[in-house]
Amino acid sequence: MSDRYLTFANSSTGRRLVGALGLPAPVRLERWMAGRVRPVDGALLLGGEGELLQAVMPFANKLTDQLFSARDGQFDLPRWTAEHGPKLKALVFDASHLTRFEQLIELRDFFQPTFKGLANSPRVVVLGRAPESLKDPVAASVQRSLEGFTRSLGKEIRRGGSVQLLYIGKGGEQQLEGALR
């Protein structure tokens, strides 16, 4: 969609006309601006229990000034709740510890309450282990299923959001900061 259509569709007259004709109403996407101190301009929610989240914690405060945890007492961060927490600009879920299909319920338990609390142009990152690096075939299948989950999540996110799945191999934890910036 061109910029002229975006401008028109977001004007007061354009909104009425676009709605009446059933045309798509594009969202103005948030772009990087020079001089921004931190990559995430808003609240960041961390979830999951894997070792990759442990690797994120040393630099998490460089990403944003509003860090929250999905659980009480995790990393000494305040717990985010949909009723009382701020709108979320980014979510990071570490799924590297998921090795059995029964554990995939943790994805729903984390993401379902957060979707109503997302700000415009949110960024969602799911961290997993490279399936080919796992010896257990069930664990490899569980990690591969994260791809389908993130594709589905990407279709549901709305408001100009993006969803990424990062498969991290053993020893790749040192590059996480660059990937999350």
Where are these regions (language model features)?
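Glycine-rich nucleotide cofactor-binding loops and adjacent beta-alpha elements
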Residues: 1-181
